[in-house]
Design a protein with these regions (language model features):
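Conserved phosphate- and dinucleotide-binding cores of soluble alpha/beta proteins
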Residues: 2-147
Length: 147
């Protein structure tokens, strides 16, 4: 893939450091590739997506290879999460998605790497290593820019 000048997308959650949770739609791996391939990553959200602690409200999507789903889920439970298989759904890459509920993410950068080191994980929906460069947030009365 060639370098992109910019990449514009939404997020399921964001914090003041412009770290994100994405992947509710199941395209997290391709979205992360696009974010890494862009000079500027612009995220457009509404105010309901803001949180002080990622993962508190929205589940973290993790793309897994089918044969590893149970093993990955056991590891995620050891880490304190409640993994739930997204039944009847496949990612854009034909893999399965496990959504991890009740999984507050205190240090997103570290957890992103830790989850990706579990054998069978393709990618997870934490965008902390490649976080947004700009967040455009719409409220009922205004548009705020976090850059």
């Amino acid at each position: 893939m060639h370098s992109l000048d910019f990449y514009v997308d939404g997020a399921d959650e964001y914090n003041d450091l412009k770290e994100l949770i994405k992947g509710g739609g199941g395209a997290l791996t391709r979205e992360k590739i696009l974010a890494y391939s862009s000079e500027s990553f612009i995220c457009i959200v509404d105010e309901t997506k803001h949180t002080d602690l990622l993962g508190r409200e929205f589940p973290l999507a993790i793309e897994v290879i089918e044969i590893a789903r149970s093993a990955v889920s056991r590891e995620l439970m050891k880490m304190g999460g409640k993994p739930i298989f997204r039944n009847g759904f496949t990612s854009d890459n034909g893999n399965q998605i496990v959504d991890v509920h009740n999984f507050p993410i205190e240090i997103p950068y570290e957890l992103e790497a830790e989850i990706n080191n579990i054998p069978g994980v393709v990618e997870n929906g934490i965008f902390a290593k490649r976080k947004a460069d700009v967040i455009i947030c719409a409220t009922d009365n205004s548009i705020n820019i976090l850059d």
